[in-house]
Amino acid sequence: MKKKIESYQGAAGGWGAVKSVANAVRKQMDIRQDVIAMFDMNKPEGFDCPGCAWPDPKHSASFDICENGAKAIAWEVTDKQVNASFFAENTVQSLLTWGDHELEAAGRLTQPLKYDAVSDCYKPLSWQQAFDEIGARLQSYSDPNQVEFYTSGRTSNEAAFLYQLFAREYGSNNFPDCSNMCHEPTSVGLAASIGVGKGTVLLEDFEKCDLVICIGHNPGTNHPRMLTSLRALVKRGAKMIAINPLQERGLERFTAPQNPFEMLTNSETQLASAYYNVRIGGDMALLKGMMRLLIERDDAASAAGRPSLLDDEFIQTHTVGFDELRRDVLNSEWKDIERISGLSQTQIAELADAYAAAERTIICYGMGITQHEHGTQNVQQLVNLLLMKGNIGKPGAGICPLRGHSNVQGDRTVGITEKPSAEFLARLGERYGFTPPHAPGHAAIASMQAICTGQARALICMGGNFALAMPDREASAVPLTQLDLAVHVATKLNRSHLLTARHSYILPVLGRSEIDMQKNGAQAVTVEDSMSMIHASRGVLKPAGVMLKSECAVVAGIAQAALPQSVVAWEYLVEDYDRIRNDIEAVLPEFADYNQRIRHPGGFHLINAAAERRWMTPSGKANFITSKGLLEDPSSAFNSKLVMATVRSHDQYNTTIYGMDDRYRGVFGQRDVVFMSAKQAKICRVKNGERVNLIALTPDGKRSSRRMDRLKVVIYPMADRSLVTYFPESNHMLTLDNHDPLSGIPGYKSIPVELEPSN
């Protein structure tokens, strides 16, 4: 593996993407069988991509797959296996020295495993023995709230519904979820603003909009199929404007791999008509600057007798809180807005002008907006901006949060939440004949805090890499090994499995691409994409191992063992997933005719009240919500520091690292790097390729013990006073206390640091 730093000249997509897919296929897959399966991905009769949550177009290409989707499926259907012989040769202690890429690259898990402390190895056992032992441990706890039930966004609606049903019959609302670490500010912030914790747009709205503002996200790496929609809107004359600390190739230009002309001529489409490098932590200041200019210009237009820039009728009819917002933004000083955002008043005026001129605007955002101490307020400022011109609830306009995992939104819809509504619990109890717990449970941060204090005794993980994804890894590693029970439902080995509890189990499950055969035949599961479309997913490949079970079957097996007097007919439900969907429909009325509607190509759309201008808020209207001040990260407010954000590389999906390259940013064969602007490098007196140390700072600006040593400097076009490193290696630079008090999301995108040369 050759290490080099070399500027990448190509557009996003193109032959670079094709070559990357070919390499992934060559290294992981049986080309004769498995590559054919890619043609079934994101198709009505096929399986849903296990990667991102970008929706499927109604009329998709014959090969509707992106580079990172291809990597995800190649990673899943690899012919490499992690079995008993693998663990006979590798102790847990030795595996802890492996890199995270190496661990997952070892292959698919194919049989149930139990950790043996004497040999320091995982050893195989039967499914029934695993279920019985796990059930016995769960029965031994005096308080159901001593168990944490973690969920990954790869879990299907059916498995997630059974999982929450099991946990609630057991007696707990402890549901730490991967969404707590990515888009919880969306769920909390949008619900308070517009009454629905989800985006309001459909894919068709991108065909009708005049302007798309992309802020705080990187589609070229995190949701590449979005580039096709951006390309199409630019081709028809609409505009896209990018706001991001780094220049990301996927926001700049794109060569569509499915377009023969662009591929053969090596041509490309310019995406962003303008690109603004806001400083890390400067989004709120920028947004308030835009709103101030809009209000001032609207006032001037009114005084001169010209038409209003704002949608006064919409504001008066559909909203409350505008007067308070108006006072707040007009009191924001330009010197502070410019200092915090890193953009000039002139640049912000350009943005405001573009927004004012557009009749229909969509704002797309990702974790660059959410992963801050005031991430919830960030989301609400985006809503405020849209509400000012009536850009919610009309075609071609709205708010578009870009979710990560393919079903992270669906899991929440069917009950994976630590704060369930009274109505949901009443319907659940009525359907099954038991009284669910009503006390709020733990989200991710509270869950890890309970583990660290010894309050929690057991952790069950439905997928994911909980230990690696959380902040303050060094502080939490030892407490995780002091748990009484750890159960990991997984397809591949990861670091969380190696932090073994007194009783640790790995339970292997089918991948999204594999045939799920139950008593009544092959089963389909369902997922919900970022735009609230529900559709079926049917595996087409032979399972990687004969002992693999479905997630639904694993949940049912544990539940039957842990709850011998259960009121739920677990085995009956798993025989035919239509039965699970019938129960979901009974508990959640929005899923009416569930089984009938998922049999239609493309599935169905869950009604979004806000998109219809029905505001399910206490006020009965959409709320302008004011956030005091300009700082989205108060603990980073002092001036004697740099601010670091964590990001994925291009060869990565969440904690899964497919390879060591970050092609679009010009990094190859390595991950121990720190990105900074040429201006910042000059200020810090460092050069491209030099090694530096980063030391995390406390809220009062003092050096902490958390550090990253010998990172290679990569000079990159980006905002000053901003540094970028890779997630999850840099997660330990953040404490569990550094999170948004409203949503609980960790502040991964704004960590105060100090830089020093390495010796």
Curated annotation (Swiss-Prot):
InterPro entries noted in UniProt: Asp_de-COase-like_dom_sf, MopB_CT_YdeP, Mopterin_OxRdtase, Mopterin_OxRdtse_a_bac, Prok_molybdopt-oxidoreductase, YdeP_MopB
Superkingdom of origin: Bacteria
Binding site for [4Fe-4S] cluster: C49, C52
A cellular component term, taken from the record's GO annotations: membrane
GO biological process terms held by the UniProt record: response to acidic pH
Matching SUPFAM superfamilies: ADC-like, Formate dehydrogenase/DMSO reductase, domains 1-3
Keyword match Oxidoreductase: yes
Cofactor: binding comment: Binds 1 [4Fe-4S] cluster.
Induction: By EvgA.
Cofactor(s) the protein needs: [4Fe-4S] cluster; Mo-bis(molybdopterin guanine dinucleotide)
Pfam families: Molybdopterin (PF00384)
Protein function: Probably involved in acid resistance.
Family per record: Belongs to the prokaryotic molybdopterin-containing oxidoreductase family.
Descriptive protein name: Protein YdeP
Source species of the chain: Escherichia coli (strain K12)
